[in-house]
């Protein structure tokens, strides 16, 4: 008889969303064969054994770590806002952020395989999934390794910023990071704004200008003006400093003989389509399922 470990139970729980005791029973019956145990649960529990891994993880936290010449920003996701405040989940996110900074993994897969607490990052994640009962995932991370200065700012646990800068004191770095969290620039300078964003903004400006009924040359100037305004609004150096509306970020940095090399901004769930529950459809599906039994 194969020994059934807690990590095996947690892994099966993560795959099937079945109760812990049912997972242990299935593993015992399958003599430790994970695939066989999963099959047994599917037969026994039917639709109740839905995969936690198929559920959308649009909530979560952003964590950061700076040590030596390296700094990191990590986004970890969960299913509900409630779990995003769970102490175990928050502690795990901090450990992951530190690993990114100190171990320099190539990607999320490499990060997941790193040693953590006598196991691996992914095994610890799976154990948390089993304990908490929600799908948890490491979505993305960024790492800066530099001889320059680093600053990080977390707005609660949902917005995180990492900044590389030179020539300024620590407070300036923190101020810039806080500004980025508040104003959410998409690039450092107007020259760095992605071409697809500029094209989208130009298209919108052209549609609006065309409705004015003005001559083509005037319309062209209106479009160019709108695009230039957009570029200033979304580029960090051109934005008005949130703590002093009399100067831009670029002016503030020059006054302190400082400069920003790059930054990263993470907002939890950005770009993830969150599932919206349809209660009526859910009830209808349950009724239909009951009729088939």
From Swiss-Prot:
PROSITE patterns: EF_TS_2. It holds the Pfam family EF_TS. GO terms for molecular function: translation elongation factor activity. It is found in: Cytoplasm. Keywords: Cytoplasm, Elongation factor, Protein biosynthesis. Gene3D superfamilies: 1.10.286.20, DNA helicase RuvA subunit, C-terminal domain (1.10.8.10), Elongation factor Ts, dimerisation domain (3.30.479.20). Signal peptide: none annotated. GO terms for cellular component: cytoplasm. It comes from the Bacteria. The keyword S-adenosyl-L-methionine does not apply. Residues 80-83 are annotated as: Involved in Mg(2+) ion dislocation from EF-Tu. The keyword Nucleotide-binding does not apply. HAMAP family: EF_Ts. NCBIfam families: tsf (TIGR00116). PANTHER family: ELONGATION FACTOR TS, ELONGATION FACTOR TS, MITOCHONDRIAL. Belongs to the EF-Ts family. Associates with the EF-Tu.GDP complex and induces the exchange of GDP to GTP. It remains bound to the aminoacyl-tRNA.EF-Tu.GTP complex up to the GTP hydrolysis stage on the ribosome. This is Elongation factor Ts. The lineage of its organism: Bacteria, Pseudomonadati, Pseudomonadota, Betaproteobacteria, Burkholderiales.
